[in-house]
Amino acid sequence: MRALGLVVEYNPFHNGHLHHLTQAKQQTGADVVVAVMSGTFLQRGEPALLSRWYRAEMALAAGADLVVELPYAYSVQTAERFAEGAVTILAALRCSVLNFGSEKGEIAPFYALAEFMNDHQVAFNHHVKQFLKDGVSYPKASAQAFSMLSGHEKLLPLDQPNNILGYHYVKAIQRLGISMEATTTLRIQAGYHDKEFAGPIASATAIRKALLSGENIETAVPAHTARLIQMYKRRYRLLHTWEHYFPFLQHKVLTTPLAELAKTAECSEGLEHRLRDSLFSASSFQGWLSATKSKRYTQTRLQRLFAHLLTGTTAEENAAIQQSGPAYIRLLGMSETGKTYIRENKKTFSLPIVTRQGELRRYGQAGEQELRISQCYWLPLPPQALKQEVTREFQQKPINWEKRS
């Protein structure tokens, strides 16, 4: 069976995602679609609106055959680490082809960009360091260094989210020496961060904004997604946003010694002082974020730092986990086709499959981190509901889609 790998967040799953999944499967001639999905916290440092289980079901309802989780040590990371973790897991599941959405739908420019960057990596790193000394953020320093090196060459710009991720998928495949073909599918209409909500195709950013404003989003998402969102809101009386976690972050920053705060992943250059000082003038998470943000510290970097603060994740812990790569594959859900694929190929997978949360304890620091992060996600719930969800996480089996439909 030819397995297609997709790297996703589905926050939430919308019509643009459905188009990508359908077209990617058709374009690659795949027999099985494997989605590796961020779990509770996402690449840009945001809590997922809905739990991994609801989002996994959205994917299965739309045609994914296997949904597995991208561990926290890779999901709340730079594009490079994010891509490396995802590609490693897809390779472990014997995916022979990876597909991602892009503005032009052409893969050749991504390979050309990867080749150019391989040839100029030393000079690129040097220029990035020089620009960082000027006090700009890492993304801006990278974009400026790339612009300086590329000159008049017709290369993909490295200042668009989909280009950055696509480039890093190709780079990860090459760096890890994996036998996997990278392909890309043309994105339709809405851009990655478009904030306007109009028509059947809207960005996840616009859909989240509409959802949190109480607007109807049914024209922009599959019917099953809309039903699951309503079910989630009725059950938990929230969609997870940073505002729900603000009191816990306040407590953490105000009661933790500065020397300990400085050990948090993404916290460097005395940022712990800025976090505490700006907190005194903030009455909301957004107020705190605005007061802390600067030319050097972008919203994305700060949000990742906040995720690490909330979950007690240190730079040392992440480095230790990443050093040996993903240790297991956490299975969230499967279709009948996915189940058949696992049965026929399980012995050749290069990583073990985990089907219950309790099994994570076998995987040392990586497993313990995931257990902690999973519990932190439910902190906004009232005490009794929090206890129920933490218990439920240990009882939850992978979703068997046909049996639920």
Swiss-Prot record:
**Quick one: a GO cellular component term?**
cytoplasm
Top EC class, one word: ligase
Residues that, per the record, bind ATP: 7-20, 101, 162, 187-188
Q: Which UniProt keywords apply?
A: ATP-binding, Cytoplasm, Ligase, Nucleotide-binding, RNA-binding, tRNA processing, tRNA-binding
Question: Which Gene3D superfamilies has this protein been placed in?
Answer: HUPs
The record's InterPro entries line, in alphabetical order, gives:
Rossmann-like_a/b/a_fold, tRNA(Met)_cyd_acetate_ligase
Where does the record locate the signal sequence feature? none
What reaction is this protein's catalytic activity? cytidine(34) in elongator tRNA(Met) + acetate + ATP = N(4)-acetylcytidine(34) in elongator tRNA(Met) + AMP + diphosphate
- Keyword ATP-binding, does the record have it? yes
One Gene Ontology biological process? tRNA modification
What Gene Ontology terms describe what this protein does at the molecular function level? Answer: ATP binding; ligase activity, forming carbon-nitrogen bonds; tRNA binding
In terms of Pfam families, this protein maps to:
HIGH_NTase1
The function of this protein is: Catalyzes the formation of N(4)-acetylcytidine (ac(4)C) at the wobble position of elongator tRNA(Met), using acetate and ATP as substrates. First activates an acetate ion to form acetyladenylate (Ac-AMP) and then transfers the acetyl group to tRNA to form ac(4)C34.
Task: Tell me the HAMAP family matching this sequence.
Answer: TmcAL (MF_01539)
NCBIfam families registered for this protein in UniProt: PRK13670.1 (NF010191)
Family statement drawn from the similarity comment of this UniProt entry: Belongs to the TmcAL family.
Q: What is this protein called?
A: tRNA(Met) cytidine acetate ligase
Task: State the organism of origin.
Answer: Shouchella clausii (strain KSM-K16) (Alkalihalobacillus clausii)
Gene name as annotated:
tmcAL
